[in-house]
């Protein structure tokens, strides 16, 4: 028989940097989850993704056990790293802060497509390009 799910927690945590301090500790503590056990498991699973914020969905069961799924880093993090910038433009229509090539967009799509709402690479590239433009980044051929 399947375990009874009592909660689902969605967080974004820096890879390899999960610790009991907020926001992780309070979110897990409210559900009665062993915080250190989660932190160790999360840090181990994300050791090859250092430098990114990782979205994680934690499913908590009635016996206080848990499972979690890590997703790919947000598209904006991947875009910023590819463009070599730390933040997007404050006014993307007037200020351009960097540029990406179609090849760089396709690299991002290859990493991110598993978490996107399309499986078509062409459509996914349009989504990523739109995100880049809204950050003040020019997409060039």
From Swiss-Prot:
**Is Coiled coil one of the keywords?**
no
Q: How is it modified after translation?
A: One or more lysine residues are methylated.
Coiled coil segments of this chain = none
What are the GO cellular component annotations?
Answer: cytosolic large ribosomal subunit
An example Pfam family from this entry, by short name, is Ribosomal_L11
Instruction: State the source organism's domain of life.
Output: Bacteria
Is Repeat among this UniProt entry's keywords?
Answer: no
Provide the alphabetized UniProt keywords. Answer: Methylation, Ribonucleoprotein, Ribosomal protein, RNA-binding, rRNA-binding
Q: Which InterPro entries match?
A: Ribosomal_uL11, Ribosomal_uL11_bac-typ, Ribosomal_uL11_C, Ribosomal_uL11_C_sf, Ribosomal_uL11_CS, Ribosomal_uL11_N, Ribosomal_uL11_N_sf
Q: Where is the signal peptide?
A: none
GO MF terms on file?
large ribosomal subunit rRNA binding; structural constituent of ribosome
The family classification in the record reads: Belongs to the universal ribosomal protein uL11 family.
- Complex formation: Part of the ribosomal stalk of the 50S ribosomal subunit. Interacts with L10 and the large rRNA to form the base of the stalk. L10 forms an elongated spine to which L12 dimers bind in a sequential fashion forming a multimeric L10(L12)X complex.
Summarizing the function annotation, the protein's role is: Forms part of the ribosomal stalk which helps the ribosome interact with GTP-bound translation factors.
What is the protein name stated in its UniProt record? Large ribosomal subunit protein uL11
Q: What species is given as this protein's source?
A: Campylobacter fetus subsp. fetus (strain 82-40)
**Encoding gene, per UniProt annotation:** rplK
């Amino acid at each position: 028989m399947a375990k009874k799910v009592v909660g689902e927690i969605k967080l974004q945590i820096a890879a390899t940097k999960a610790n009991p301090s907020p926001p992780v500790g309070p979110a897990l503590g409210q559900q009665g989850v062993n915080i250190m056990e989660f932190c160790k498991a999360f840090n181990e699973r994300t050791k090859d993704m250092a430098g990114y914020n990782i979205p994680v969905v934690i499913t908590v069961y009635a016996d206080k056990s848990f499972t979690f799924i890590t997703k790919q880093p947000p598209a904006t993090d991947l875009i910023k790293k590819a463009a070599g910038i730390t933040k997007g433009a404050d006014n993307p229509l007037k200020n351009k802060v960097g540029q990406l090539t179609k090849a760089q967009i396709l690299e991002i799509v290859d990493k991110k497509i598993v978490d996107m709402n399309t499986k078509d690479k062409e459509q996914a590239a349009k989504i990523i390009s739109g995100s880049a433009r809204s950050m003040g980044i020019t997409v060039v051929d």
